[in-house]
Amino acid sequence: MKSLVLVKQVPDSNSAFRLNAAGTWVDETNLSYTVNDFDRYALEELLKLKDAGKVEEVVALTVGGADAAAALRTCLATGADRAIHVKDEAIAGSDPFVVARAIHAAIASEGFSLILGGLQADDDNHTQVGGLVAGLLDWPFASAAVALSLVDASTLRVERELENNEVQVVDVTLPAVVTVQTGMNTPRYASLKGIMAAKKKPVATLALSDLRLDLKDVEAKLRTVSLAPPPKGKGAEILTGSPDEVAKALVSRIREKTGVL
């Protein structure tokens, strides 16, 4: 069975963020980047299936500019067998449908049986690419997976996280697309041996012309009008004194603000 993991390079959450001049995205100057956290769990799940002898090949794919190659190198060092980089500045940073369309075109002749990806991206939280890819392929789709297991060669059992901590168990017929939650496993890290081996693993680089797409095919349908930081809260009041004095002052403040107590 051939498998594919969809990965995205996103800004490191520890970076210092500020808006760009247009107020439509963050200023990417001097940001550090990493593999989207949700996608790390998807990769680990496929590597576990490969370790168990149920998957023959794990391929990593990303859509983005030249810098996105770093995410693929991380996946290769962690254990993926090869990678596909859809690299074109016309696609980089586009909307979910355009990204899904590029993925669909890139894998048309690959013959994958299982495609995993993260439930969402840490930077934009669109939660759409996996479902759109499944729709373009006309494959079954399951989202928010917290556990996966192969029932047989053609059936994947998926435990899905629902609201109120409920879990739904569904069987999907392969080939299929599944997006996964964080916390479903413990992602492995690249070893020195893996980092060295990654340098010899193949990375196929595809542009729009290779996908038989042109600029009108990748014209974004979604445009960010504005982006704003969360409103700043009012400064906290620090209560001082003995424990009894602080407790009385706290009760007084609650009574003033809410009318209870």
Give residue ranges: language-model regions.
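N-terminal glycine-rich FAD/FM-binding segment characteristic of electron-transfer flavoproteins
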Residues: 1-261
